[in-house]
Amino acid sequence: MLKQVEIFTDGSCLGNPGPGGYGAILRYRGHEKTFSEGYTLTTNNRMELMAAIVALEALKEHCEVTLSTDSQYVRQGITQWIHNWKKRGWKTAEKKPVKNVDLWKRLDAALGQHQIKWVWVKGHAGHPENERCDELARAAAMHPTQEDSGYQAEA
């Protein structure tokens, strides 16, 4: 039987693009681990992706995961859009390169053999874990220490 894990994530950007951060909570049998990191120049979508990636990469064995995010971009991207992106060589329906492809590939790899249920929660609506992740992400964004090497400014 797989371990049942809950993950809650959020990303934040002070300006978009601008300094950003992510926050994540990983919960297993009443134990919690939090993750957060701030980046000097990034976007909100990149931080939403990073929150999910970091939490999933922290799992040491195959798990049954319920991952809650307030990002439709992440939830729809990983459950719907990614299949066609991969078929098209990481291009959109308009034959343009997929934005944030470095992180989409990393998230795809982080899924591994996990069984994941993706849950969308409304942001800033009083969901306790989402609010905590938002606080972690905002605090990290206010004190960025990392450079987002994959961020590419729009041409």
Curated annotation (Swiss-Prot):
<dbReference type="InterPro" id="IPR022892">
    <property type="entry name" value="RNaseHI"/>
</dbReference>
<feature type="binding site">
    <location>
        <position position="70"/>
    </location>
    <ligand>
        <name>Mg(2+) 1</name>
    </ligand>
</feature>
<dbReference type="GO" id="GO:0000287">
    <property type="term" value="F:magnesium ion binding"/>
</dbReference>
<keyword id="KW-0378">Hydrolase</keyword>
<keyword id="KW-0460">Magnesium</keyword>
<keyword id="KW-0540">Nuclease</keyword>
<feature type="domain" description="RNase H type-1">
    <location>
        <begin position="1"/>
        <end position="142"/>
    </location>
</feature>
<dbReference type="InterPro" id="IPR002156">
    <property type="entry name" value="RNaseH_domain"/>
</dbReference>
<dbReference type="InterPro" id="IPR036397">
    <property type="entry name" value="RNaseH_sf"/>
</dbReference>
<comment type="subunit">
    <text>Monomer.</text>
</comment>
<feature type="binding site">
    <location>
        <position position="134"/>
    </location>
    <ligand>
        <name>Mg(2+) 2</name>
    </ligand>
</feature>
<keyword id="KW-0479">Metal-binding</keyword>
<dbReference type="GO" id="GO:0043137">
    <property type="term" value="P:DNA replication, removal of RNA primer"/>
</dbReference>
<feature type="binding site">
    <location>
        <position position="48"/>
    </location>
    <ligand>
        <name>Mg(2+) 1</name>
    </ligand>
</feature>
<dbReference type="Pfam" id="PF00075">
    <property type="entry name" value="RNase_H"/>
</dbReference>
<dbReference type="GO" id="GO:0004523">
    <property type="term" value="F:RNA-DNA hybrid ribonuclease activity"/>
</dbReference>
<dbReference type="InterPro" id="IPR050092">
    <property type="entry name" value="RNase_H"/>
</dbReference>
<keyword id="KW-0255">Endonuclease</keyword>
<comment type="function">
    <text>Endonuclease that specifically degrades the RNA of RNA-DNA hybrids.</text>
</comment>
<keyword id="KW-0963">Cytoplasm</keyword>
<dbReference type="GO" id="GO:0003676">
    <property type="term" value="F:nucleic acid binding"/>
</dbReference>
<dbReference type="InterPro" id="IPR012337">
    <property type="entry name" value="RNaseH-like_sf"/>
</dbReference>
<feature type="binding site">
    <location>
        <position position="10"/>
    </location>
    <ligand>
        <name>Mg(2+) 2</name>
    </ligand>
</feature>
<feature type="binding site">
    <location>
        <position position="10"/>
    </location>
    <ligand>
        <name>Mg(2+) 1</name>
    </ligand>
</feature>
<protein>
    <recommendedName>
        <fullName>Ribonuclease H</fullName>
        <ecNumber>3.1.26.4</ecNumber>
    </recommendedName>
</protein>
<comment type="similarity">
    <text>Belongs to the RNase H family.</text>
</comment>
<dbReference type="GO" id="GO:0005737">
    <property type="term" value="C:cytoplasm"/>
</dbReference>
